[in-house]
């Protein structure tokens, strides 16, 4: 999860987030090289006589500054499209969970089980226990099995919301009357926090999301106790 004065991204918990982190580093390297080259040329122009005021035509230069940006854009677009298709692909999900956004809480329904559904509200600051996180803890966590593909169906009962868990690389809009899909896969157990990421009213900041990823055996015990 995030911590104060953090400079980088949160630790990746899913294969998708690992790919997004690698793509971020890849793109940042390209931006850094371009920025360094531009600053170097500007510094040469200011400190030397590297100017050609009499040049009227330079076909070679124009060819280079046309082809080179196109190649750079291709180097950015190809991995981006690959990740985009990976995020939309899901085969044989082990579990399907329907998520509904409300003003201002989330409700969850495990569609593979009968009567396994609940609302998830933020715990007020005055009710927090020692060690719990302010504005991030909820009364009912979403318990899911780790290392299995899980399909999240996301929608809204009222206004636009957005279901986002950064460490899993997830951010999916919850739109009234529309059902969006996301894939959740966790490589390790633990608690993973997120929040509504679409301004949805006065209590928008009080819609946390908590996923508790556990081994399959623990999930089966939990689901049996909830039914």
UniProtKB/Swiss-Prot annotation:
GO annotation terms (biological process): ATP synthesis coupled electron transport
Cofactor note: Binds a dinuclear copper A center per subunit.
UniProt: Mg(2+) binding residues: 198
Entries under InterPro entries matching the protein: CcO_II, CcO_II-like_C, CcO_II_C, Copper_CuA, Cupredoxin, Cyt_c_oxidase_su2, Cyt_c_oxidase_su2_TM_dom, Cyt_c_oxidase_su2_TM_sf
Complex and partners: Component of the cytochrome c oxidase (complex IV, CIV), a multisubunit enzyme composed of 14 subunits. The complex is composed of a catalytic core of 3 subunits MT-CO1, MT-CO2 and MT-CO3, encoded in the mitochondrial DNA, and 11 supernumerary subunits COX4I, COX5A, COX5B, COX6A, COX6B, COX6C, COX7A, COX7B, COX7C, COX8 and NDUFA4, which are encoded in the nuclear genome.
NCBIfam families with a match to the protein in the record: CoxB
Entry protein name: Cytochrome c oxidase subunit 2
Gene name linked to the record: MT-CO2
